[in-house]
Amino acid sequence: MKFENLFIIALLSILFTSISSAKPIAATLTIGKNKQDFPGYVTKADDNNIYVSQFENGVSPAGYALSSVSDISWREPDDWKEAIDLWNRNEYKKGSAAFLEAMDNYKGIADSKHPLMKDNIGAQAVFYYMECLRRTGQFKAMMEPYVRVQKVNLGSKWQDQIRLFQGWAHLAGNKWSPLNLMMETYQINEKDIPGVGTYTVAPNELPLKNGINVHHMAQIFFLRAKSTDELANELDKELQAIEISDETMEERNELSSRIGVMRSKALTDYNRAMTINYGQDRGLSLRSMRDSLYLIKKMPSYAENFTMQKEAHGMAKLLNGLNPGIFPSELNDLLQEPVDPNAGK
């Protein structure tokens, strides 16, 4: 009876280890001074050790000091290849599900900070999951993996986008002031641009710092536009709450001027976001179009400016043609061709 109990305990232990560990990944470890190759199945790794089983199901893994390992050659799992294929085909909705599964499957290696574990697929899965969420507009769902992506072992080439994930987290939380301040860190200071004070360069054309790639620039322009747009809306509420009188005229004019500059800047940035990367980030381009249409209708000159009305009509037709599902019903009036007030004169 005693031996039977021990056997059952041992069997349960093996089963529990197999179930609780991450999905094993086939790999070959090069170990020792003689650089011998040891094939096996990696189940997990921490900052100091890597755990390898001789069995495909990952049972009974043995720990090896990463300090004794000179190289690790990974074999890409089929489910990982399928997830990357979805990414490469721009199928981000399906990709988000695939990378979420990969996050769970390979979580056992994601957090290891050892240099040999840098850019492992467990860490990459968190990154690609966040990117799929971003590209499909699931911004609030990015909050939990955003905490996680900061902990995984990804190299320098991933860090610029990881930093931008913070901006999307601000957007998800409607934190417009922190988002706007964050976007200011990417732009050249106004005092460093000759001509801003003399109207050679308009205040809504503040350029970004050198060295930012176009993929990130598109996101920065959109996030800067969105935060500026929303902050202008907050100022507009303040303006509407001020009593109209001679005593408040100066205050109202000052606020109105600030709102005008901010909305002009936001509109410029929306246009940049949708065009700078040739629309390669389709979701971002569509959102930029939609939000710019909302903004155009708020511009004081829109009601009498036929040129602006024609531009809004053309963009509305384009957006509705590209993705009718994203086109808001409250903008349906823009689908009607505007009438030139000077026609026939």
Placement of each model-derived feature along the sequence:
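Bacterial N-terminal signal peptides that target proteins for export
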Residues: 1-8
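Bacterial N-terminal signal peptides
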Residues: 8-17
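Compositionally biased alpha-helical segments
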Residues: 21-181, 188-241, 247, 251-282, ...
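Terminal, low-structured helical/coil segments at or just beyond the last alpha-helical repeat
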Residues: 242-243, 247-250, 260, 298-345
